[in-house]
Design a protein with these regions (language model features):
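Acidic, surface-exposed loops and disordered segments
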Residues: 1-249
Length: 249
């Protein structure tokens, strides 16, 4: 069973190279309107999206991320912010304490709002024939990002997103089989993931082998060696959350 929307989602690829062709004002407005109509936890609408058009701000974000293409001029850059500040102001203006907004529970609702909005924008952008790439790398060094965006207390940059006209045609990265990532009712127990994923490991190795790089590895090897070594894995995220007045209880 398929339709145009499903076909677009199943064809998702990460695009890191873009043409020097900014989105039109109408395209940006459409994508932001899609984000605005995304489902939101408890109708609190705890997300703000920043469209980065200032070259200096973008360069600062690019430097913090460690990804050269983030700080350039190609593709439009959006930052999805978990935003409890706006609701704290609304409460203050009505004489209500905002202490509850510093809880991890409320941060998780804002985090969900931001991520759902980002994914809705990706689906919409790809349906328009545009390319996208998520930028979790903005959290490799979150303090400069918070500073560059002039984020107030009770806000946090959750994820970045580049959207634009693709200047590359990469292959689609294989995913684990449905039998591994889905189950009915209760969590599945697997005796050996290494054995279960053997065919998938070969598929991933072949994918990297066919690319124009020297990287050769399987999925299970990636999991065994890559977690905890990249910038985003050792970033002081919890410290910055606390500095922003978030997740204090």
């Amino acid at each position: 069973m398929t339709n145009e929307t499903i076909a677009s989602q199943l064809a998702h690829r990460t695009i890191r190279a873009y043409k020097d062709q900014p989105l039109t004002e109408a395209e940006v407005t459409t994508l932001m309107d899609v984000a605005r109509h995304t489902a939101t936890s408890s109708f609190l609408q705890s997300c703000t999206i920043l469209h980065i058009t200032d070259p200096k701000v973008r360069e600062a974000i690019g430097a913090a991320s460690g990804q050269p293409y983030v700080g350039g001029t190609k593709g439009d850059l959006f930052i999805f912010v978990a935003d409890l500040y706006r609701n704290s102001r609304i409460r203050a203006e009505q004489g209500v304490s905002s202490e509850a907004l510093s809880s991890i529970n409320l941060f998780l609702t804002a985090l969900e709002d931001a991520l759902l909005a980002a994914q809705n924008v990706v689906v919409a952008a790809e349906s328009m024939g545009l390319g996208t790439v998520y930028l979790g790398s903005i959290l490799a060094d979150p303090r400069p990002v918070v500073k560059a965006l002039e984020l107030p207390e009770l806000t946090f940059p959750v994820v970045g997103l580049l959207v634009g006209h693709a200047d590359q045609d990469p292959g689609q990265k294989p995913r684990m089989p449905l039998s591994v990532v889905t189950a009915k009712n209760t969590y599945p127990r697997v005796e050996s993931y290494t054995e279960t994923l053997a065919d998938y490991d070969r598929e991933v190795t072949e994918y990297y082998d066919l690319r124009s790089g020297s990287r050769l590895e399987s999925f299970t090897h990636l999991v065994a060696t890559n977690i905890g070594v990249g910038g985003a894995h050792v970033s002081p995220i919890m410290e910055v959350l606390h500095e922003q007045g978030l997740c204090l209880r």
